[in-house]
Amino acid sequence: MRTPLIAGNWKLFKTLADATALIDELVPLVSDVKDVEIVVAPVFTAINTVAKAAGKTGVKVAAQDCYWEDEGAFTGEVSPKLLKDAGCSHVIIGHSERRQYFGETDGTVNLKTKAAIRAGLTVLLCVGESLAQRESNDTFKVIETQVRGGLADIPAAELTQIVVAYEPVWAIGTGKTASDAQAQEVHAFIRTLVAQIYGPSEADAMRILYGGSVKPENIKGLMSQPDIDGALVGGASLKAESFAGIVRFKG
């Protein structure tokens, strides 16, 4: 049985004071939720503060990116080892905004994923196609390239530290959402692909999240699909009430 995971990506929003207020407001709204893993991803500067505020409440903290070296002369970078030290249990790697604006490639995603696993973090490995790619019927080709690239040379034993997040780029921040059936089709493809690479039991155990304009209004339909195991939430995670509404998808 795969435990659902709901992750909130706060992106480049929330000062230290705002982040503290948000986690303080969120915790009481979700503290009684059982059998759902809850993760929030604040900006780097708020990670330690949010981790301390979350404490033993069950809400976990992720970073939005990391570097692939543990330490060294890499000005401006943050290693998975330091993220773990700051209170992170998870890290988002390969988000479409990193790929689009910062030159992230499948190769760097793979290096970062290996480094994060080495540090003991759980990776939220993001994949997804653009609108142009979907319209030219390249969705599955793009997804396969990204999944194979991200998982290259990662042994099956380490898959327990990887969660795949499918985020159709055309649905991020646009208000457009893939239909439940569209999302399920890609999730099923990803699971089949993981089965081809590693085997059916590994594929069956892997959690695959959907990301792309997830809201309290559409989470129930998405979560009713057999291969959708949770959500990577953007805008709706910036308000405690809406994020809690997503976390509480079971009612």
UniProtKB/Swiss-Prot annotation:
Q: Which domain of life is it from?
A: Bacteria
Where located?
Cytoplasm
Q: Which organism is it from?
A: Trichlorobacter lovleyi (strain ATCC BAA-1151 / DSM 17278 / SZ)
Q: What class of enzyme is it?
A: isomerase
Q: Does the keyword Transcription regulation apply?
A: no
Q: Which GO terms describe its cellular component?
A: cytosol
- Which terms in the Gene Ontology molecular function aspect does this entry carry? triose-phosphate isomerase activity
Positions binding substrate in this chain are N9, W10, K11, G173, S213, G234, G235
- Report the protein name in the record: Triosephosphate isomerase
Keywords assigned by UniProt?
Cytoplasm, Gluconeogenesis, Glycolysis, Isomerase
Instruction: Enumerate the transmembrane spans.
Output: none
The record describes its quaternary structure and partners as: Homodimer.
The catalysed reaction is: D-glyceraldehyde 3-phosphate = dihydroxyacetone phosphate
List the NCBIfam families hit by this protein, alphabetically. tim
Q: Which residues form the active site?
A: H95 (electrophile), E167 (proton acceptor)
